[in-house]
Amino acid sequence: MEDLTYNTKIAVLKILNDIINADNIVKDVEVDYMNEIARSFELADNYMNEVNDLVTLQALSIISSLSVDLKEKIAQLMGNMIIIDKDINYNEVKLYNEVCDYCNIDKDFNVKDYTDFS
């Protein structure tokens, strides 16, 4: 997702961070996945400061203005975040679906879309 601006990368990480926290349980595997994405975005180690400073509504606004292709890639990242800990949580799925609805991403979470989940 090299087409993303710096602010868009922070917005994506904000939404992923919200998903991580939706079940009130933060697992190491979720943090590791988030850090892996941040590394792929080539962000500095202190990226979480900016993520935490960004309001979720601002993040949604940024994401909603992206192309359909980029939005679908972001939906895939969100889905991966939901399944990464092998625990499909209702609040995480609800947040996924709400983000997709707000940002006009034509998807609903479906575990069958994630072949790595067992």
Per-range role (PLM):
Residues 1-118:
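Small-residue-enriched hydrophobic alpha-helices in membranes
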